[in-house]
């Protein structure tokens, strides 16, 4: 705290002995020691308070930085998610467009894709084929 050498302390002690006297010198020295101790404790308390405030200020700055970085990360994630959603929507639309029948197909082709039995009946109608067997009347061979 103070930069005193041994010779300077001896000079101060001799001056105090002359001014205060030998009877009261121990009492004054004890009181000075107590006051010096209080002063040192007060200075250390002030230092610790200042350090605490500085740490709180640093923590607040650090918290703000973390919050800003978190917000930046959140916004970048949101933009990436929006881009992925739009690309997924485009793929879904393309798949739906490929799955839908084209406009230039005939009704028979669309029926063929839907039901093979319907194709047979439509072809039979077009060819006018009869699927039921005819019985010949009068030719009984029994």
Curated annotation (Swiss-Prot):
GO terms for cellular component: TAT protein transport complex. The keyword S-adenosyl-L-methionine does not apply. One of its GO terms (molecular function) is protein transmembrane transporter activity. It is found in: Cell inner membrane. Keywords: Cell inner membrane, Cell membrane, Membrane, Protein transport, Translocation, Transmembrane, Transmembrane helix, Transport. It is a single-pass membrane protein. The chain crosses the membrane at residues 1-21. InterPro entries: TatA/B/E (IPR003369), TatB (IPR018448). Residues 99-142 are annotated as: Disordered. Residues 107-124 have a biased composition (Low complexity). GO terms for biological process: protein transport by the Tat complex. Part of the twin-arginine translocation (Tat) system that transports large folded proteins containing a characteristic twin-arginine motif in their signal peptide across membranes. Together with TatC, TatB is part of a receptor directly interacting with Tat signal peptides. TatB may form an oligomeric binding site that transiently accommodates folded Tat precursor proteins before their translocation. The Tat system comprises two distinct complexes: a TatABC complex, containing multiple copies of TatA, TatB and TatC subunits, and a separate TatA complex, containing only TatA subunits. Substrates initially bind to the TatABC complex, which probably triggers association of the separate TatA complex to form the active translocon. Belongs to the TatB family. NCBIfam families: tatB. This is Sec-independent protein translocase protein TatB. It comes from Azoarcus sp. (strain BH72).
